[in-house]
Amino acid sequence: PVGYRISTYAVDPKRLAAFTPEAVLKACVSSDVPLYPFIANSAGEDGFDYAPAMAALCARDYVDIEKASCSFDSDSFKAQLQLLELQEAAKAESFPCNGLFYYDVIADAGTVAYRAERYLLPPMEQYVFCGYPSDHANGSVLHFSELFAINANSKQKSGAWAFLSYLLTQPCQESMQLRLPVNDSVLHAQLAGQLKKETITQHEIDLFYQLVDGLRVADYPTDPVEQIIREELAPYLAGDATEDETADKVQSRVYLYLQEQYQ
């Protein structure tokens, strides 16, 4: 990789002490006013569709690829289903609505700190990055902008390596736009510049690096499992399948897929 972005969520730590699906669900349903898991984004008539983000995270969190097993029949995944159902009601609300999590994309040094005004939302006095609700340390998602590899049978390995080396040089990394450089010394220099201009604080830089340190990457190709989850979410959100039925169906289909591919 030569660059990356991070999709995450910011939350006021005073409003939520834990970021597991069960904790988020409890906070939403016990609120005196309608409280949705996420701030609804303006993205067409249907609002922002959180199903793909939920499917991507769950394909990572509820699969043990070493054992070729999964836990979609767990209370945690069922809480994920309930959160997504709650969020569906937010689509009918005017923008913005009352939500716990604020979606954020970190694409360069200038967006390392969360700024609610970028999304036309009221500011938070304080925030932490928590990612999508997860039983693990962080539910944020790492997106590589480009991935390069050298073919083992290539007869031009030296030239290919020279090109890859150039992509990691300071001048090339400094010129990247809408992505964070993988060359950490370049990123440090960019953040130091932001700090000098007082557009960011050291605390906000520390929060960013805590986020980076907590990122998890899926250890298998998750697309087939994500597809299964999305297919079973459709009847659930349409009211044609119960929470237990959906969880059992996803568990059965994903387990069969894992046994066929990885056992």
Enumerate the language-model features and the residues they cover.
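Periplasmic solute-binding protein
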Residues: 1-26, 36-67, 142-150, 224-234
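Periplasmic-binding protein-like
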Residues: 33, 164-188
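Short amphipathic alpha-helical coupling segments at ligand-binding clamshell hinges
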Residues: 79-80, 155-167, 246
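Extracytoplasmic/periplasmic substrate-binding proteins
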Residues: 79-156
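Glycine-centered hinge/linker elements that transmit conformational signals in sensory
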Residues: 47-48, 52-55, 60, 65-97
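Short, charged, surface-exposed loops that flank catalytic or proteolytic processing sites
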Residues: 18-24, 235-250
